[in-house]
Amino acid sequence: MIPIISIEGSTDIAFTENVQKRFEAFGFQTIDVADGNDLEAIGKAIEEAKADQTRPSLITVHTQIGYGCPAKQGKASAHGEPLGVENVAALRENLKWPLEESFAVPEEVFAYYAQYAA
């Protein structure tokens, strides 16, 4: 795993260390999840990590900065610039999020967390 985007832009001129290999050298179990939007793969990685009780685990999850926002996806500007109204609308549309509300929590998410609040 080598991070490729920072707040300043691409990291390839200043950072080339493979962090996952470093942790392997320390004796960690390392598990790689190629798609940070694949919740099933993340769940499997967690179960795999929990199954190995002999050593610590590092789960590397690859994500794309600004995912879903056409003007920011894969760009360093996703770190520190406001999206703006048009980009928020495009993001909501891409992620199939309600367009009418400025802030919304899906009922199933609210219900899940409500069970722990009591």
Regions found by a protein language model. Name each.
Residues M1-Y116:
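Glycine-rich ThDP/TPP pyrophosphate-binding loop and its adjacent helix/strand module
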